Swiss-Prot record:
Annotated keywords: DNA-binding, Transcription, Transcription regulation
Record's protein name: Transcription factor E
GO molecular function, a single term: DNA binding
Biological role stated in the UniProt entry: Transcription factor that plays a role in the activation of archaeal genes transcribed by RNA polymerase. Facilitates transcription initiation by enhancing TATA-box recognition by TATA-box-binding protein (Tbp), and transcription factor B (Tfb) and RNA polymerase recruitment. Not absolutely required for transcription in vitro, but particularly important in cases where Tbp or Tfb function is not optimal. It dynamically alters the nucleic acid-binding properties of RNA polymerases by stabilizing the initiation complex and destabilizing elongation complexes.
Transmembrane segments: none
Subunit (UniProt): Monomer. Interaction with RNA polymerase subunits RpoF and RpoE is necessary for Tfe stimulatory transcription activity. Able to interact with Tbp and RNA polymerase in the absence of DNA promoter. Interacts both with the preinitiation and elongation complexes.
Keyword Transcription: yes
Recorded family membership: Belongs to the TFE family.
All residue ranges annotated as the HTH TFE/IIEalpha-type domain in the record: 1-93
Species whose genome carries this gene: Pyrobaculum arsenaticum (strain DSM 13514 / JCM 11321 / PZ6)
Organism classification: Archaea, Thermoproteota, Thermoprotei, Thermoproteales, Thermoproteaceae
């Protein structure tokens, strides 16, 4: 489960900041937090990983927004508010179950739409069209002009249903 969590962290950050490097950096931050099993401030994380504090804060705040890491607020002796970040097994479990729930909802909608309608696909550019779209375009692909082919959804629905059932077990 930890590997799936790290994958989600890396890809989410890479996608948000349009930078695979930021994704790898987020993965390092989360691995550090998980391995140390303690709350660390953003300054301490930046020092341990030898990266800028600004980048660290940016990544940590984004991960917090996605509920992929935990944060605790502390007041220092001089009455400053300091944030301490952590990752534990409960955070990982919640993150994975949350993602699984979102995927289950989307799969459910996709399975429902596939069972309720007929679909056609362009054999050249592999774009799927509903029956209404295929009729509107006269049975040809509007992009390349190739004749659209009817898609038998039974196999696809069965595959999606199996994936849905696996996700329900998480």
């Amino acid at each position: 489960m930890k590997d799936a969590y790290l994958y989600v962290v890396e890809k989410s950050v890479a996608w948000e900041f349009d930078s695979p490097e930021y994704g790898r950096l987020a993965r390092k931050i989360v691995e550090l937090l998980y391995e140390r099993k303690e709350d660390l401030t953003d300054d301490r994380i930046a020092i341990l990983l030898n990266i800028s504090t600004a980048e660290t804060r940016r990544i940590l705040q984004y991960l917090m927004k996605l509920n992929l890491i935990g944060v605790r607020k502390k007041t220092t002796e001089d009455y400053r508010i300091e944030y301490a970040w952590y990752v534990d097994d409960e955070i990982i479990r919640q993150a994975i179950s949350s993602r699984a729930r979102v995927v289950r909802e989307k799969l459910s909608m996709l399975i429902r739409s596939l069972t309720e309608g007929a679909y056609y696909i362009c054999p050249s550019c592999f774009i799927r069209y509903s029956l209404d779209e295929a009729v509107n375009w006269g049975g040809t692909c509007p992009i390349c002009g190739t004749q659209l082919e009817y898609v038998e959804n039974v196999e696809e629905i069965n595959k999606l249903t199996k994936i849905f059932e696996k996700l329900e077990k998480l």
